[in-house]
Amino acid sequence: MMTSNILSRFLPPNGSPSVYETIRNHDATSDSSDVEERAGLTLEDGPGEHYSDRELEDAMADAGRSRLLDRDDAFISRRSPRKASVAGPSKSNSRRRHFSRPRWAHDASPSHDFEDGDDDVPASLLVEGHHDDDELKSRLPPPPTSHITPDDRQPSRPGPSTRGVRGRGRAAKEQQPLHHADRRRAPAVRWSLGQPNLNTVDPKEKAMWMWANVENLDNFLKEVYTYFLGNGIWSILLNRVLSLLTFAFVVGFSTFLTNCIDYHKVRGSKSLNDILIKQCTTKMSLSSTFLLWLLTLFWIGKAFQCLLDIRRLKHMHDFYYYLLGVSDTDIQTISWQEIVSRLMTLRDANPATAGAVSARHRKFMGSQSKQRMDAHDIANRLMRKENYLIALINKDILDLTLPIPFLRNKQLFSRTLEWNINLCIMDYVFNEQGQVRTLFLKDTHRKALSEGLRRRFIFAGIMNIFVAPFIVVYFMMHYFFRYFNEYKKNPSQIGSRQYTPLAEWKFREFNELWHLFERRINMSYPFASRYVDQFPKDKTVQVAGFVAFVSGALASVLALASIVDPELFLGFEITHDRTVLFYLGVFGSVWAVARGLVPEETTVFDPEYALLEVINYTHYAPSHWKGRLHSDEVRREFTELYQMKIVIFLEEILSMIFTPFILWFNLPKCSDRLIDFFREFTVHVDGMGYLCSFAVFDFKKGTNVINQGDRRDPARQDLRADYFSTKDGKMLASYYGFLDNYGANHRGSHPATRRQFYPPPAFPTLGSPPAGEMGTIGDRLDQTQTRHGLAGPFMGQQSVFGPSRYGLTGLGDHASPAPSILLDPHHQPSTSGFRGTSRAAGVQRYRSSRAHPPISGTIADGDESPVATGRSDPSRPAANAAGASSAGGVGTSDSNLGDSWRMNLVEDGDDDNTEGGENVDAIAGGAGVLGLIQQFQRVNKDSRGRTAVGL
């Protein structure tokens, strides 16, 4: 008794099961056909049985044949109920009848009867009724012709039926069968994928059959996209084979260098045989032998997996070639937009509708994900997990700082840490079908899920300690073998830079596929390098110039002496055991590195313009950068995201040491926020499942869904709107970027908004304004956004719940998007969403620091500019937008917008006065402040008879 009491203090109570057991029980008891519950793609009639599209297609075909039945046979069958009752059990128990009857025609279990009650149409109005309805069973279509047994093929005939007659008939059929037995077993071949006869089927028909029987569309589209990125079956197989050979070479050559050479004999030996260790593998240490066997088993497993994937790659090749019409030679040059267009064409060519199926199966077919498969849906499926990670990085929910006293402000996000985050968080939140577990969408299990996530972080940190040494050794050897020769030939490449993994996740937008993001980022590299070189490093340049001069002079003298007498001088030792060739290599490398630090003499320094060009491609510009693009603080922050390759590699190596500490101390503190994040930023889309709320674009509302906040007083912002919004305009930039990639021209973006790529010039070109004429940063941003048609770099926060923190930029001048053939009708962008955007706010957003006088004091002269009058009343955005749309229409400019607010009295003419009065009456409803002001001005006009000023 005492022992049990002691153990009960340490062991968990029986009433609190593990969170993993709760998740497994919840997944096991959930109905897989319920999209709201599991968002799955299969429908089970019983344990282990799955409905396929082929069975539904046969059901539809059988329904068509049932209309051709003879009415006399139907009438006779109703006149002999006793005969049917006698023969029924024997046929139902036969094996042949089991194959001929579709599984969807079986009696439904009572546990599923409640699903039909969820339909919008009452059961009394449905043609099919319920599963257990006898009338429905009588109207079920007959089995296919090839499935009918010989007994079923013979129609019933009137006449007496006795046991003797039936016995003689059966004996005659056994002696002389009317139909061969093979014809009765033939249909079983079509229902099984593993039958040998499937190899003789037409490849196009087989590809169509596999497309019709896709159960998990997320996994299928990932295979389609991976095949597209791999450039075909042969390129994928070649890449995998070369990867296996590279792994084997690195492991084998490293083992040879560390265990098979006696380095003590190198100095006095003259051949390789003198320093080789005979039978070195038998003399290896126990740890080296264990590691070698472990890597060998891993290599064998990868090779076996590569062999198994050949069949799957062949199926994907047939899908591309026969259904999409894309060969392996064309897949390297075709665009992804064209692939999406052909997928939508294939979807539209194979409708999955039927009129002779039950309500439950119609509901299943209506929720098939293949009906929701345009560019927006495909991107959401492919990036279902990545969109959440983009939002996590954007909202700074993950604490990635190093838990070290002198490095607490340093963020570390490497590929190793990214892999651990996917393992601990994504695999915990998502189930096997790739959907968010509904358990995370309920706040009742918040504490248990948070504790489970903490334990996963701690366990992953412990596992990293055991795995890190092996990974460090492999990556160091691989990096050395790959880049040493490149650095030896071109030493200046040591200083080459690259975006860090954290920068890539900061720059990547929602629903932006990897190849589109990679293309956009690659185009920014020349401008990023130019920006980093823009800052004059006067002290560094002077020292580097001196070092380059000295090293170059010494290398020149040695090279000249070698040319004069090469045979004598090349073997000449300058120091002990150091010849001229050695010092030529040393001085040449020092000169190359120092010369690379010295900029060209003709370089024009303009860091603001260079960074603006970078922002045009990265779409990343925090709000605190505004007005400070020339500062050294912004440069240091940008260089943290754009570091040298050698530094990134060292961080990857060091991250294998520091990752366990981040997993132990930092990330467990974020577990509560992570659980809340997935619960609060997950929405359900019919036919697709659960998605990140930021990745579901509202095309109908356009940019009007993003409200503009008061930039003058950030303290007045709604905290709830701040919480439910993205930082730095991420959602709006993603929206515009998506429309740019999948615009009206599906082979590229719209020609009007597409910007051609040019390498960065050494100085501002004719198309680039000089430094003296570029004006303030606000004007330059306005010019950049107008020229490129992209979302402004300083977009602040936007939310679907409330006003944003900072004013949006780049919206007023953005053209209304044209309809796209890559989007379904419910995803077509609405021009009204762009028409309603207030352009007065676009004029105001860069001049918000100027105080706005009250309305009572806005008495302007007649020659005042329309823009100034357009900014006279920022307190009425609704009336401003309405006035702009009524007077200027869709394409009105800022000057027209200002005119729409003016009450022209004499000089503008009677027509303008009448139109302006009618528009204001329509807006203000004939009363209110605007109506009183208009009446007051008309009274002044009639009484004084002279020109009044505009409002």
UniProtKB/Swiss-Prot annotation:
GO terms for molecular function: phospholipid scramblase activity. Residues 1-240, 311-456, 478-542, 600-645, 667-951 are cytoplasmic. It is found in: Preautophagosomal structure membrane; Cytoplasmic vesicle membrane; Golgi apparatus membrane; Endoplasmic reticulum membrane. Phosphorylated by atg1. Atg1 phosphorylation is required for preautophagosome elongation. Residues 1-54, 72-186, 810-919 are annotated as: Disordered. Residues 457-477, 646-666 dip into the membrane without crossing it. The chain crosses the membrane at residues 241-261, 290-310, 543-563, 579-599. Keywords: Autophagy, Cytoplasmic vesicle, Endoplasmic reticulum, Golgi apparatus, Lipid transport, Membrane, Phosphoprotein, Transmembrane, Transmembrane helix, Transport. It is a multi-pass membrane protein. Residues 23-39, 104-114, 128-138, 171-180 have a biased composition (Basic and acidic residues). Residues 93-103 have a biased composition (Basic residues). Coiled coil: none annotated. Residues 262-289, 564-578 are lumenal. GO terms for biological process: mitophagy; piecemeal microautophagy of the nucleus; protein localization to phagophore assembly site; reticulophagy. It catalyses: a 1,2-diacyl-sn-glycero-3-phosphocholine(in) = a 1,2-diacyl-sn-glycero-3-phosphocholine(out); a 1,2-diacyl-sn-glycero-3-phospho-L-serine(in) = a 1,2-diacyl-sn-glycero-3-phospho-L-serine(out); a 1,2-diacyl-sn-glycero-3-phosphoethanolamine(in) = a 1,2-diacyl-sn-glycero-3-phosphoethanolamine(out); a 1,2-diacyl-sn-glycero-3-phospho-(1D-myo-inositol-3-phosphate)(in) = a 1,2-diacyl-sn-glycero-3-phospho-(1D-myo-inositol-3-phosphate)(out). Homotrimer; forms a homotrimer with a central pore that forms a path between the two membrane leaflets. Forms a homotrimer with a solvated central pore, which is connected laterally to the cytosol through the cavity within each protomer. Acts as a lipid scramblase that uses its central pore to function: the central pore opens laterally to accommodate lipid headgroups, thereby enabling lipid flipping and redistribution of lipids added to the outer leaflet of atg9-containing vesicles, thereby enabling growth into autophagosomes. Phospholipid scramblase involved in autophagy and cytoplasm to vacuole transport (Cvt) vesicle formation. Cycles between the preautophagosomal structure/phagophore assembly site (PAS) and the cytoplasmic vesicle pool and supplies membrane for the growing autophagosome. Lipid scramblase activity plays a key role in preautophagosomal structure/phagophore assembly by distributing the phospholipids that arrive through atg2 from the cytoplasmic to the luminal leaflet of the bilayer, thereby driving autophagosomal membrane expansion. Required for mitophagy. This is Autophagy-related protein 9.
